[in-house]
Amino acid sequence: MINSFRLLKDRKSKKGFSLLEILLVLGAIAALIVAAFMIFPKVQASQRIDRESRNLTAIQAGVKSLYGGRAKISSINTDSFIASKNAPENMIQDGKLINEWKGNVQVEYSGNHGKYNIIYDAVPASDCSKLIAAVSGNFVSIDVYNGNGGTQVKNLEEGKNIDIAATSAACFSEDNSTIIFASVI
């Protein structure tokens, strides 16, 4: 027993980390980095959709604030909307309305019964159907235009509620989409 105690006492303790321990830590760090790069784009896309759905709601509220109670809204356009200070400030860049994907946003009269359009340019295919699904309840009609042509995915005036399959098909394109959201005052 004394000999075994002396052997333990004489033995010098090793300082530092072994190669195996270092490789284990590096492997764990690499796994965390890979996981972060897989999750981060999804979180970013979700945040873009959330911001744009809030922007669309703010544009609608601004138009209603500006033109609510008026029988005639034919003077509505993007420039007058921005000048009225009803446009979301986070969208105004160089006197234009710009969306999260750096596309133009236009507000215009659609020509009938107090109806106006909010036009979103440069919406990527990966976010197109998600944006439409997030805000479809706020609009009477929604149209998607891209390299595949144009598709109406909702028209309450014709009794056509949102068609998710048609939305996915319309948004599936190598080109960015232009989405026209129609609303009524």
Q: Which positions does each model-derived feature cover?
A:
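N-terminal leader/signal peptides at the extreme start of proteins
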Residues: 1-15
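Short, flexible active-site loop motifs that bind/organize anionic cofactors or intermediates
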Residues: 12, 39, 118-121
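Short, contiguous, pocket-lining structural segments
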Residues: 12-15, 24-32, 48-55
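C-terminal juxtamembrane segment of a hydrophobic transmembrane alpha-helix
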Residues: 20-22, 29-46
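Short, charged/polar micro-motifs that form catalytic or ligand-binding hotspots
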Residues: 22, 46-49, 117-121
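Membrane-proximal N-terminal amphipathic helix
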Residues: 41-83
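Periplasmic/extracellular, small/polar-rich flexible segments of pilin-like filament-forming proteins
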Residues: 68-185
